[in-house]
Amino acid sequence: MQFMLILSEDPELVATDEQRKEAVQRVGEYAMSLLGDGTLKGGSPLHPVTEAKRIRTRDGQRRVLDGPFAESKEVIAGYFLIEAPDIDAAVAIAARCPNAEFGSVEVREIVPMG
């Protein structure tokens, strides 16, 4: 089974250059460990939310909103696509992710298409 780990971070917990550097290093090491044991199937960090766009269409009218988006304290920082036998195993893998300490990690099963 495949799962997406949606990595969020609280900007207040990675506010300094030193905190950000440490976070990037720790997440990189975590990713390498998943790659090494064959668990990691894909993933990537994302550009900052300040560069994001959100599109909403209501009643045929499209609006494009510029980030950051005030309704959320945590921001999505990246994702991993992993292989695991079941949701419990995926949660155990996600629990080791450093983002759980300075944000959160959401685990979602991928729905096979086709």
What label would you give each PLM region?
Residues M1-G114:
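Conserved, structured core segments of small domains
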